A protein has these predicted regions:
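Conserved N-terminal/central alpha/beta ligand/cofactor-binding core
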Residues: 5-6, 43-171
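N-terminal Rossmann-like FAD-binding beta1-loop-alpha1 element of flavoenzymes
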Residues: 15-40
Length: 171
């Protein structure tokens, strides 16, 4: 019966439970695991989530010719009234630091030199080298602000964050 099943369940000693193992869940796990024991729950295979299959890139203001105001305006225009300005501003203002954190984790984003067809997938060696990232321009954007990992950005982000989480003693 159900009560016997509950008594036989494994008990985990943890401080934080994160439901979801995509980019958001793994990022939260990695950002909290230095001061807490973290358990990440997934409803199925880890790579069944949307992050793994996302092919596009990540939009961030990383070029001197671009600005947060321009990115916000582009996003609000493309969102045709569905976006909340305060949320868009919040995300855009933090986009460069989020990309910097992903670079520090080792996500192999395409760089200007690798985009020239060297075949090398080396990522910038430090967040200070964000200027070496290859930027593309996609629909709805007035500037080149899309960073990518070839044509499989989501897979690269997911695999890197998953590896970091597996390596962390508190996750």
């Amino acid at each position: 019966n159900y009560m016997n099943e509950i008594r036989e369940m494994e008990t985990l000693d943890t401080d934080i439970v994160i439901v979801g193992s995509g980019a958001a869940g793994l990022t939260l796990a990695l950002r909290t695991a230095d001061f807490a024991r973290v358990t990440v729950l997934s409803k199925g295979d880890l790579q069944d989530g949307a992050t793994y299959y996302a092919q596009g890139g990540i939009a961030a203001v990383l070029d001197d010719s671009d600005s947060a105001d321009s990115h916000v305006a582009d996003t609000l225009h493309a969102g045709v009234g569905l976006c909340h300005r305060d949320v868009v501003e919040h995300v855009v203002e933090r986009s460069a630091s989020a990309v910097s954190w992903l670079v520090a984790q080792g996500v192999p984003f395409t760089t200007k030199s690798t985009a020239v067809a060297t075949g090398d997938d080396a990522a910038p060696s430090s967040p200070a080298e964000l200027s070496s990232l290859h930027l593309t321009q996609e629909g709805g954007h007035s500037h080149r602000r899309i960073i990518h990992a070839t044509d499989a950005t989501g897979k690269a982000v997911f695999q890197t964050l998953q590896q970091r989480a597996r390596e962390h003693a508190n996750i």
